Regions:
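Compositionally biased, intrinsically disordered low-complexity segments enriched
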Residues: 4, 82, 96-99, 118
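A glycine-rich, often tryptophan-bearing local segment used as a flexible ligand/cofactor-contacting loop or short
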Residues: 11-88
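Intrinsically disordered, low-complexity peptide-like regions
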Residues: 83, 89, 96, 180-181, ...
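Glycine-rich nucleotide phosphate-binding loop and flanking beta-alpha elements
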Residues: 6-7, 42-44, 136, 187
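Active-site Gly/Thr loop motif
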Residues: 89-105
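Extracellular ligand-binding/catalytic regions of CAZymes and related secreted enzymes
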Residues: 26-29, 37, 52-67, 101-106, ...
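Generic preference for well-ordered secondary structure
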Residues: 9, 91, 127-130
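The substrate-binding groove and active-site-proximal loops of carbohydrate-active enzymes
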Residues: 1-18, 133
């Protein structure tokens, strides 16, 4: 996961001029690993690119050097696994401007022809791009689904899982216990999935914590 503005310590800055580092990341993802970039991941103007992993991420920032490139990929894929639990337009906070997608990249959200969220397959691996992700219960679910999708872990979704993103499941398998936590000041209804995939419906009161045996 690489998060932050370009040319900062958070994303790496000039470190990305080191081919050993960029090659290692590409090799990791190409062989089946996952990559999540938020903001301007690997952002540093060098050798004609701003995002130094643009080929991996499938997204690049327009900084004036590619104005003459045709940019036809703007179709949104709103039914993607990552967006399945969203209840409203995704909150990207400040987001990022001038981001465009390469051909072969799936755009999940674009606004005024500026990419806000996209996914891309790179070899056997996958990457997720998000322009910004301020904390909220809904965005936390988006991040969780992004992690699962980028690591080919979609089948693991319904393990220690709450269908309502306002409610969390914490499993302490070695101790034989798990708890369900309502993070809100209102009662919530949800379906809880255990580690084996079995489930049960639950109504949980405001701020309530319920404990169960595994």
């Amino acid at each position: 996961i690489n998060v932050g503005d370009g040319d900062t310590a958070h994303t790496g800055g000039a470190v990305w001029e080191n081919a050993v580092i960029s090659t290692a990341i590409r090799e990791f993802v190409y062989r089946g690993g996952g990559f999540i970039g938020v903001g301007e991941p690997a952002g540093h103007q060098y050798q004609g690119h701003y995002l130094q992993l643009a080929d991996l991420i499938g997204v690049e920032k327009e900084t004036g050097f590619t104005l003459n490139y045709d940019k036809y990929n703007w179709e949104e894929h709103k039914n993607h696994f990552i967006l399945a639990d969203t209840t409203k337009p995704v909150d990207f906070g400040e987001g990022k401007k001038n981001m465009f997608a390469y051909e072969g990249t799936e755009i999940l959200v674009q606004r005024d022809k500026e990419v806000q969220m996209a996914v891309h397959e790179f070899g056997e691996g996958r990457s997720v791009y998000i322009s910004g992700l301020p904390y909220s219960f809904e965005n936390s679910r988006i991040l969780y689904r992004s992690i699962l999708w980028s690591t080919h872990g979609e089948s693991l979704l319904h393990q220690w899982f709450s269908t309502n993103f306002n409610v969390e499941v914490h499993a302490y398998v070695k101790n034989g216990k798990f708890c369900v936590v309502n993070n809100t000041y209102e009662p919530q209804n949800t379906v809880i999935y255990r580690g084996d995939g079995s489930s049960f419906a639950l109504k949980i009161e405001a701020n309530e914590i319920k404990w169960y045996a595994v």
